[in-house]
Design a protein with these regions (language model features):
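Extracellular, repeat-based ectodomains that mediate carbohydrate processing or recognition
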Residues: 1-134
Length: 134
């Protein structure tokens, strides 16, 4: 739930961003009424942008992480983050989260820690010597 009692949902949608899969969000009030239209999260539209996760922040905004399968991290798929305010307006550009870029990084999750920092986890092919380390 968001600080105002509402909530936000995210999904991947085919061709809604003009290409393949893109990530979108929508805000709802505490009664379940939509209070925003579809908000595009990803600005990179090549390849697939999907598998999103959302975390509500204390200031009423939210963070979205997702997998970008566009090669924008230099090799394969990478993990990207974007922050939004309480009205679903973006307050950051896309931020690459993963520093290890060989192969595929995918299946990201995000949570807010007690101190307000974000913790992002994901699986990474071969980074720890196995195919799917976290």
């Amino acid at each position: 739930a968001l600080a105002n009692g509402g909530f936000v949902v995210s999904w991947s949608s085919w061709a809604q961003d003009g290409q393949n899969y893109g990530v979108f969000t929508r805000l709802f009030d505490s009664s379940g009424n939509a209070v925003s239209g579809d908000v595009q999260v990803n600005t990179t539209t090549s390849g697939y942008q999907d598998h999103s996760s959302i975390a509500a922040m204390d200031d009423g905004g939210f963070a979205v992480v997702w997998t970008s399968d566009s090669g924008q991290d230099g090799d394969g798929s990478g993990i990207f983050l974007r922050l939004f305010d309480s009205s679903a307006s973006a307050i950051t550009a896309e931020i690459q989260v993963n520093s290890y870029t060989t192969g595929a990084q995918s299946d990201a999750n995000v949570t807010v820690l007690d101190n307000g920092n974000l913790l992002v986890s994901w699986t990474s092919d071969n980074q720890d010597g196995s195919e799917g380390g976290v």
